[in-house]
Amino acid sequence: MNTSRLFSLLFQGGLVKRIAAGLVLGIVVALISAPLQETIGFNLAEKVGVLGTIFVKALRAVAPILIFFLVMAALANRKIGTKSNMKEIIVLYLLGTFLAAFVAVIAGFAFPTEVVLAAKEDSSSAPQAVGQVLLTLILNVVDDPLNAIFKANFIGVLAWSIGLGLALRHASDATKNVLSDFAEGVSKIVHVIISFAPFGVFGLVAETLSDKGLVALGGYVQLLAVLIGTMLFTAFVVNPILVYWKIRRNPYPLVWTCVRESGVTAFFTRSSAANIPVNIELAKRLNLDEETYSVSIPLGANINMAGAAITITILTLAAVHTLGLEVSFVSALLLSIVAALCACGASGVAGGSLLLIPLACSLFGISDDVAAQMIGVGFIIGILQDSTETALNSSTDVLFTAAVCMEEERKNAA
């Protein structure tokens, strides 16, 4: 397939095919940018990279407003006494995170990995204690609503939208209709933004590969193999088992749909928060209950941290093995779970799980200097690690929501 044919695919066909075309074109541009730089006088990959920057910026800009109006409208229009599926979804989120940590601990001990610690990185923004992380979480909940939207504090946005939605359940029908119209209007804007995903992926891939390349990953092949292998095992073995537990039929068609439609986009945006609009659009196409997914998907972007659990656990155990420390399997599992649950404070941020490595390392008695260097390792492999982690986190949000909604449909049909 020639390049002109690939360019034409950016404008026609289904979204997935167009994204695939953008991916291939991004790789091509990244490969030819360096040889062409002397001829054309500039780095082509850096120039087209602005497309990716604009796409991610647009997604992140619309996400807080989308969550605010969608959740508020869904709760305000919800009939009093209607059964909610949120409890089951939250259980799946937490269970999925627990099992991801469990699988990561097994992988960490089965394939012990040592790394050459990179140059010391600044870790001043990393949380120092569990209490501090929890305090930050509480302060985010009670943040000023306008400030929460302005700074994309999704926990604060979610808290205020839930509070206002519940308070407006007794409002007049006219008020509820206005909220629904606002939510619908923002959803249409999201649909337009998502239609530009192929161009965003094209820019992101071209700039990322041109800037960092794959050569820098050579020294961390085993660590990457353990990390990505564990995430793939969670996505295609652990998660399908949980989904089958709910829907009682072959889970893989649903799993593959979520990975293809949500995971691919999340892989390139590297932000669960930026992928919220994509997940909501997918949930709508799957005909899921809007009152459920409008709350569960934004919530999942903050608390469904299977990928973060794996990253924190594997990198911390790599530090343990590098230093030659002896840690029991049970201690490693428990401490990693604590760190993964606290990762809620860093969710929705590209590379956010890396900030929790000092927390996990401190629980093992590892010094801040070593922990900071492990963050450096995380940034080096982040081109693949962070992308895969976000794809797992975000696709699981819509996967578990769909599983619970389908379970409810199955029960109602019985």
From Swiss-Prot:
<feature type="transmembrane region" description="Helical">
    <location>
        <begin position="223"/>
        <end position="243"/>
    </location>
</feature>
<dbReference type="InterPro" id="IPR036458">
    <property type="entry name" value="Na:dicarbo_symporter_sf"/>
</dbReference>
<dbReference type="InterPro" id="IPR001991">
    <property type="entry name" value="Na-dicarboxylate_symporter"/>
</dbReference>
<keyword id="KW-1003">Cell membrane</keyword>
<dbReference type="GO" id="GO:0015826">
    <property type="term" value="P:threonine transport"/>
</dbReference>
<feature type="transmembrane region" description="Helical">
    <location>
        <begin position="305"/>
        <end position="325"/>
    </location>
</feature>
<keyword id="KW-0472">Membrane</keyword>
<keyword id="KW-0997">Cell inner membrane</keyword>
<feature type="transmembrane region" description="Helical">
    <location>
        <begin position="54"/>
        <end position="74"/>
    </location>
</feature>
<comment type="similarity">
    <text>Belongs to the dicarboxylate/amino acid:cation symporter (DAACS) (TC 2.A.23) family.</text>
</comment>
<dbReference type="Pfam" id="PF00375">
    <property type="entry name" value="SDF"/>
</dbReference>
<protein>
    <recommendedName>
        <fullName>Serine/threonine transporter SstT</fullName>
    </recommendedName>
</protein>
<comment type="function">
    <text>Involved in the import of serine and threonine into the cell, with the concomitant import of sodium (symport system).</text>
</comment>
<keyword id="KW-0813">Transport</keyword>
<keyword id="KW-0029">Amino-acid transport</keyword>
<feature type="transmembrane region" description="Helical">
    <location>
        <begin position="89"/>
        <end position="109"/>
    </location>
</feature>
<dbReference type="InterPro" id="IPR023025">
    <property type="entry name" value="Ser_Thr_transp_SstT"/>
</dbReference>
<keyword id="KW-1133">Transmembrane helix</keyword>
<dbReference type="GO" id="GO:0005295">
    <property type="term" value="F:neutral L-amino acid:sodium symporter activity"/>
</dbReference>
<keyword id="KW-0769">Symport</keyword>
<dbReference type="GO" id="GO:0005886">
    <property type="term" value="C:plasma membrane"/>
</dbReference>
<keyword id="KW-0812">Transmembrane</keyword>
<feature type="transmembrane region" description="Helical">
    <location>
        <begin position="337"/>
        <end position="357"/>
    </location>
</feature>
<feature type="transmembrane region" description="Helical">
    <location>
        <begin position="22"/>
        <end position="42"/>
    </location>
</feature>
<feature type="transmembrane region" description="Helical">
    <location>
        <begin position="189"/>
        <end position="209"/>
    </location>
</feature>
<dbReference type="GO" id="GO:0032329">
    <property type="term" value="P:serine transport"/>
</dbReference>
<feature type="transmembrane region" description="Helical">
    <location>
        <begin position="148"/>
        <end position="168"/>
    </location>
</feature>
